[in-house]
């Protein structure tokens, strides 16, 4: 067997997990809901970001798909085992940071994240890193 067949994920609640912080960059895109984020949705939002910000080495992806979803073919009767692996997903929970950005102009970043969040299946918000020296509160738009 090439891929492990996992059980289906059941999301218990839609509470936003506030303790997921920005570690590497200055800004981040935080999810506000639960979903299975597919690799196609992730690449579509990445293309939308890179279309606006033409810089390299500015983006850190924290949500990489690792979970295989299985599907049975059409017109197949019930039973006879689990289906074959079809789609790779990332089980995204509310409050998790999807992308982190560093050394990027703030106005360009907001425009890029607005276009990329339209391609994601969950509502999102932009968060800023907490600075201990100036004691600034983490801001969000």
Swiss-Prot record:
BP terms from Gene Ontology: mitochondrial translation
Superkingdom, natural source: Eukaryota
Subcellular location: Mitochondrion
Pfam families linked: Ribosomal_L16
Cystine crosslinks: none
The protein's name: Large ribosomal subunit protein uL16m
Similarity annotation: Belongs to the universal ribosomal protein uL16 family.
């Amino acid at each position: 067997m090439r891929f492990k067949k996992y059980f289906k994920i059941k999301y218990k609640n839609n509470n936003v997990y506030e303790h997921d912080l920005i570690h590497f960059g200055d800004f981040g895109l935080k999810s506000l809901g639960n979903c299975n984020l597919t690799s196609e949705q992730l690449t579509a939002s990445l293309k939308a970001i890179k279309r606006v910000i033409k810089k390299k080495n500015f983006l850190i992806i924290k949500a990489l798909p690792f979970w295989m979803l299985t599907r049975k073919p059409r017109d197949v009767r019930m039973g006879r085992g689990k289906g074959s692996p079809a789609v790779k997903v990332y089980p995204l929970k509310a409050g998790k940071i999807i992308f982190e950005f560093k050394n990027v102009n703030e106005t360009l970043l907001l425009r890029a994240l607005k276009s990329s969040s339209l391609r994601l299946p969950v509502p999102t918000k932009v968060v800023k890193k907490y600075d201990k020296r100036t004691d600034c509160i983490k801001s969000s738009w």
